[in-house]
């Protein structure tokens, strides 16, 4: 009788022990799973994975070594047209201006220029390496997540290219497109369309041309220093000869040719096409096909005293290949496709926009 009681107690102890071990193991697995979940955001900043809506089995992997594309230039220089044409390509996504990226880059530049601030940061352990790593993660997060996934991601924030050299350092495989336009046309567009740009006095052609000269000189110099990583594209030539320049551009970016880039207006608002912002000033222009309407609208609008001093006010005009005294200038003859687009727009009853 006593032997049987001992046997029953032993069985009961074994059952209780087994249940306890099972519970502890399960609890440990749950804790491990939660820790993994909590660590995921930290990992995602270094290695982001998104999935397309079309094929959930195909992930897009993003990291600092991917071939990012940055489009920039002085505002009103064709940056929106360029990004819309690239956005029409099925393998590329640019999207709207983030507005955040040039501001955070300007802040980083300010820290670097101030010897006192840099010393304070170094003393706090916030070294250049720490800041570069943080900038990589922050910028990549913005670029990746503010739009749809794609094989090639691009960012279009015009003044971001003031930091072209730094961007090339933290994104070693990135490429840059610098949009160049006749400064007289860019400035007339800013003033006539009342496009507010920090530091530009829209009541003065002289002031705006001086600021244009300073900004484009900064970006153009960095573009040349970046050598085969940066391609300057003249807005006038892109508009006059879109196929030639888009083929040149896609070869530069190592992206296969696609005819869709010549007809961006047909893909506006469509899935996988061109997404436009309601608040960007160029939106009402890029909904049209490529045309020459805006090329010479500045002629006859610039004050005579500014025209007289143009070569001194804006020496970058001559450096970029524009004649500062030509009024009107001769940019060249448009391709037949562009001529046809322009004629159709001129026959349209829609009121033309100033540019």
Swiss-Prot record:
Disulfide-bond pairs as recorded: 94-154, 223-230
EC annotation from Swiss-Prot or TrEMBL: 2.8.2.20
Keyword Glycoprotein: yes
Topology, Cytoplasmic side: 1-8
Site (Transition state stabilizer): 156, 282
Family: Belongs to the protein sulfotransferase family.
PANTHER family reported for this sequence: PROTEIN-TYROSINE SULFOTRANSFERASE 1 (PTHR12788:SF4), PROTEIN-TYROSINE SULFOTRANSFERASE 2 (PTHR12788)
Protein name, entry field: Protein-tyrosine sulfotransferase 1
């Amino acid at each position: 009788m006593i032997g049987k009681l001992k046997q029953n107690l032993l069985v009961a102890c074994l059952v209780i022990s087994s249940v306890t071990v099972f519970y502890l193991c399960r609890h440990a697995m749950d804790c491990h799973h939660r820790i993994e979940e909590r660590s995921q955001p930290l990992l995602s900043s270094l290695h982001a994975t998104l999935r397309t809506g079309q094929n959930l089995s195909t992930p897009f992997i993003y990291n600092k070594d991917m071939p990012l594309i940055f489009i920039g230039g002085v505002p009103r220089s064709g940056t929106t047209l360029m990004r819309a044409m690239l956005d029409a390509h099925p393998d590329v996504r640019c999207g709207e201006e983030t507005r955040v990226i040039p501001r955070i880059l300007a802040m980083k530049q300010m820290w670097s220029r101030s010897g006192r601030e840099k010393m304070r940061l170094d003393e706090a352990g916030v070294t250049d390496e720490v800041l570069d790593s943080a900038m990589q993660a922050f910028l990549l997060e913005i670029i990746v997540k503010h739009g749809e996934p794609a094989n090639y991601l691009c960012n279009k924030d015009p003044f971001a290219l003031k930091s072209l050299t730094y961007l090339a350092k933290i994104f070693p495989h990135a490429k840059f497109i610098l949009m160049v336009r006749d400064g007289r046309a860019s400035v007339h567009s800013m003033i006539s369309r009342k496009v507010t740009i920090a530091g530009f006095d829209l009541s003065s052609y002289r002031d705006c041309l001086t600021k244009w000269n300073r900004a484009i000189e900064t970006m153009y110099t960095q573009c040349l220093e970046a050598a085969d990583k940066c391609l300057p594209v003249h807005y006038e030539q892109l508009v006059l000869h879109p196929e030639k320049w888009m083929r040149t551009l896609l070869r530069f970016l190592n992206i296969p040719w696609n005819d869709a880039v010549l007809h961006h207006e047909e893909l506006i608002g469509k899935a996988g096409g061109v997404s436009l912002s309601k608040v960007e000033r160029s939106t009402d222009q890029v909904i049209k096909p490529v045309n020459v309407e805006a090329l010479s609208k500045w002629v006859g609008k610039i004050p005579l005293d500014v025209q007289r001093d143009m070569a001194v006010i804006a020496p970058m005009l001559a450096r970029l290949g524009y004649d500062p005294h030509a009024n009107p200038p001769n940019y060249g003859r448009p391709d037949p496709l562009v001529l046809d687009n322009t004629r159709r727009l001129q026959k349209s009853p829609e009121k033309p926009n100033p540019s």
